[in-house]
C-alpha cells in the first residue's frame, strides 16, 4: 500500500484488481483497530462475497448495517448476498430501496434486482421493471435482461439479441452469460448443432487454461489408497448430527433431490454452501493433509468442525433439524469430510454420464473455478475420476450413505424419497413428491427445471448431440446402465 493511500482506497484498488484476499487482510486490520469500524466490516463483507465465502459475508454485512442502517452500499451487498442465500423477499426489499434512490449504487442495485426477479421466476415483475425504464437500462448488462424478457414471447428474437451481446460486449463474463443463454434457447428450439457450435466458441473465447491435473491429484491419491485396501484413520472428533450432504457432479439431479427433501418440514436445503471448500483449505493449509493427517491437532479439527456447522446452522430454515448441503465439491474431499464431520449422511447422485456431460458443456459455469467444463474430453476425465472412487470411497471412510441413480429417482420418486428419509430417521411426507410446489428459490442452473413436476424429459438428452460422443464414452455409459434398477 503506497504511503499516501488510505486503507479504504487500498481496499477498493485491491477489489478492482481481483485481489479479494488482499482486501480482506486490510479490512481485518481496520476491525482489529476498532470493532466498530463500519468501513472495516463493509469491506470485509465485500471481500468475503468476492471470495465466495457467503456465510462470512452474511455476518459481516449484518454487522455493518447495525453500525450504519441506511448505508446504500451495505444495503446493496445485503440484497446481493440474500439472493445467493435464497432469501428472495429480503433481497428484493433491500435492492428495490437502493434501486429507487439517488445513490450512486442505484444502477448496480437495479441490475441485481432484475437478476433476482429472473432467478426467482417472478417474470411478470421483471417485465414490468424493464418496461418502467430508468437510467439502469443504459448499462450494458441491461441488454441481457431485455433479451430475457423478450424470450417469453419471441424466442428467435431473443436468440439474436443474446448472440449479439456475446459477440460485441467487452466484458467476458457478460459475453459468456449471454452466450450460454442463447445456447439454452437454441437447444430449446431443437437447433442442436448451432447450440453445440456456439458452446465450443464460447468456451474457447472465455475460458482460460485450467489445471485439470491439479484438480484430479487428490482423487488419484484416494483411488490408489482404495486399490491398496489401506484403512483410513478413524475420526478423532465426535460425530455430528443433523447434517446431510450431496455427493456428485453438476447436472446430475442434485438440485431435484435437494428441492424434494427441502419440502420436508424437518429438512432445510442450504444450497451450495462453501463450508466444504473452507474445510478442505483449512486441512491442506496445515501442511499435514493427507499424508500426516494423524498429526493434525484435535483442537484444530474441532475448530474446523465448529466453523462448518456454525455456517450451516446459520443457513438452516427455522424449525428444521437437518441441514442439507448441496455442495458440488464433496466428492473430491470425502476423507476430509469423514475426518472433520463424521456423522454426515451422504447422498451420492449419478446420472447418465453423457447427459451430465452435455448438460454441463452447454451451460454457464465459472470459467476459472470450473474450467474443466470447457470440453467434453475434460468432462469425461472428471467423470471417470469421480466414478473411480464412488461409491466405494463412502464405504471406505465410514460415511453413512445412499446411492441414487437419477433415472431411477425420476421413475420411482416415492421409493427413493422413502429410502432417503429412512436414512435420515424421518417419516415419509407427501410434500417431497411435489418439488415444483416448493417456494424455496434456487440459485443454480436447474432453477427452471425444478419448477416443473418430476419428469423424464432430460433423460437421454445426449442423443440430440450424438455426433459429439465417440467410443471413449462407452465404458462409462455401460457402467452407469449396470447400476440402474429400473429400465
Please name every model-derived segment.
Residues 18, 52, 86, 121, ...:
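Residue-level detector of the short coil/turn that links helix A to helix B
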Residues 35, 69, 103-104, 137-138, ...:
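Short coil turns that delineate tetratricopeptide repeat
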Residues 236-341, 345, 349-350:
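Phosphate-binding active sites in nucleotide-utilizing proteins
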Amino acid at each position: 500500500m503506497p504511503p499516501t493511500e488510505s486503507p479504504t482506497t487500498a481496499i477498493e484498488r485491491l477489489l478492482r484488481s481481483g485481489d479479494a484476499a488482499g482486501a480482506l487482510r486490510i479490512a481485518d486490520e481496520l476491525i482489529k483497530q476498532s470493532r466498530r469500524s463500519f468501513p472495516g466490516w463493509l469491506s470485509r463483507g465485500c471481500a468475503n462475497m468476492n471470495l465466495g465465502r457467503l456465510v462470512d459475508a452474511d455476518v459481516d454485512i449484518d454487522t455493518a448495517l447495525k453500525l450504519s442502517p441506511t448505508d446504500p452500499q451495505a444495503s446493496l451487498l445485503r440484497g446481493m448476498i440474500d439472493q445467493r442465500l435464497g432469501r428472495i423477499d429480503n433481497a428484493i426489499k433491500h435492492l428495490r430501496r437502493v434501486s429507487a434512490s439517488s445513490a450512486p449504487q442505484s444502477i448496480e442495485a437495479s441490475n441485481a434486482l432484475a437478476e433476482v426477479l429472473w432467478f426467482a421466476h417472478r417474470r411478470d415483475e421483471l417485465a414490468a421493471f424493464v418496461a418502467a425504464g430508468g437510467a439502469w437500462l443504459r448499462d450494458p448488462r441491461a441488454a441481457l435482461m431485455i433479451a430475457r424478457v423478450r424470450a417469453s414471447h419471441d424466442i428467435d428474437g431473443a436468440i439474436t439479441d443474446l448472440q449479439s451481446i456475446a459477440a460485441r460486449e467487452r466484458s467476458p463474463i457478460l459475453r459468456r452469460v449471454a452466450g450460454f443463454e442463447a445456447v439454452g434457447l437454441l437447444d430449446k428450439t431443437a437447433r442442436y448443432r448451432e447450440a453445440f457450435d456456439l458452446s465450443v466458441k464460447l468456451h474457447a473465447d472465455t475460458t482460460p487454461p485450467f489445471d485439470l491435473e491439479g484438480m484430479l491429484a487428490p482423487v488419484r491419491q484416494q483411488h490408489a489408497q482404495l486399490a491398496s485396501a489401506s484403512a483410513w484413520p478413524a475420526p478423532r472428533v465426535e460425530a455430528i448430527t443433523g447434517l446431510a450432504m450431496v455427493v456428485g457432479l453438476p447436472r446430475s439431479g442434485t438440485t431435484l433431490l435437494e428441492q424434494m427433501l427441502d419440502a420436508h418440514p424437518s429438512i432445510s436445503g442450504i444450497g451450495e454452501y462453501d463450508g466444504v471448500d473452507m474445510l478442505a483449505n483449512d486441512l491442506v493449509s496445515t501442511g499435514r493433509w493427507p499424508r500426516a493427517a494423524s498429526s493434525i491437532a484435535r483442537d484444530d479439527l474441532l475448530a474446523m468442525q465448529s466453523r462448518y456447522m456454525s455456517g450451516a446452522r446459520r443457513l438452516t430454515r427455522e424449525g428444521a433439524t437437518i441441514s442439507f448441503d448441496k455442495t458440488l465439491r464433496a466428492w473430491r474431499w470425502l476423507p476430509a469430510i469423514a475426518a472433520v464431520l463424521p456423522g454426515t449422511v451422504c447422498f451420492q447422485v449419478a446420472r447418465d454420464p453423457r447427459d451430465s456431460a452435455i448438460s454441463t458443456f452447454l451451460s454457464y459455469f465459472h470459467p476459472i473455478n470450473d474450467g474443466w467444463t470447457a470440453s467434453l474430453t475434460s468432462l469425461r476425465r472428471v467423470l471417470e475420476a469421480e466414478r473411480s472412487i464412488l461409491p466405494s470411497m463412502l464405504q471406505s471412510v465410514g460415511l453413512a450413505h445412499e446411492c441414487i441413480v437419477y433415472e431411477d429417482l425420476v421413475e420411482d420418486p416415492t421409493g427413493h424419497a422413502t429410502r432417503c428419509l429412512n436414512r435420515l430417521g424421518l417419516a415419509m411426507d407427501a410434500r417431497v413428491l411435489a418439488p415444483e410446489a416448493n417456494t424455496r428459490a434456487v440459485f443454480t442452473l436447474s432453477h427452471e427445471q425444478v419448477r416443473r413436476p418430476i419428469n423424464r424429459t432430460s433423460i437421454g438428452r445426449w442423443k440430440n448431440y450424438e455426433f459429439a460422443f465417440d467410443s471413449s464414452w462407452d465404458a462409462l455409459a455401460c457402467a452407469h446402465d449396470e447400476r440402474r434398477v429400473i429400465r
